[in-house]
Amino acid sequence: MEPLKFSKKGQDLIKLYGTMAIEGFDRTDNTHVEVAYSDFQLRAYRDHIRPTLIKHKISTVLDYGCGGSNWALHGFDEKTGQSAIEFFNLNNAYRYEPARDLDERQNVDCVISFDVLEHIFISDVPSVLRNMFSYTSKLLVLNVACYSAAALLPNGENAHITVRPPAWWKGMLDSISVEYPNITIFLICSPGFKNSNAYPEWSANDWESSNTFVINN
């Protein structure tokens, strides 16, 4: 596996997120949230993600930066009452959340990470992405918020510390994906709250097998 070594600032951030997990957090509207990381961020995208998981025959998933996600809990899908494991027809789902000392990282078919990368200190982004790539054998599914959060860190800064435009994230992934040519990437970027756009999925192998030198995806 690709070793994950956080910078000093990255380590300090994890401590702040750990404090938020225990004490809750303040918001920009001057309210306080008692229970942090309680949302299953993937739920809102479940109907868009399921065809991709089925297409790539995904049976095991690692939820990287899972927050409060519970893949075995019934009710993930409101219509059927199914859990996320049932809804996506998975054998197993594992979780990684350093702010809660939860680490089930292992080799899987697919790594999924929602609302995580914007919380990573910018110098640590390449290392975190390589760590994600190193655990998946088929697919990497990412959702990145490209806007400031309502949540505040305990030091008063915005919780979305690395806010960059979608093209920045696409370029970052393009650069790193050549090191993992067999992995397909499905990137969703959110320029605003409840405003998301998905890039067509791609892999570096797709580029190599193209009949042209100009690559447009």
List the predicted regions and their residue ranges.
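Short glycine-centered segments of the SAM/dcSAM-binding site in methyltransferase folds
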Residues: K138-V141
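A conserved beta-strand element that flanks and buttresses the S-adenosyl-L-methionine
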Residues: I112
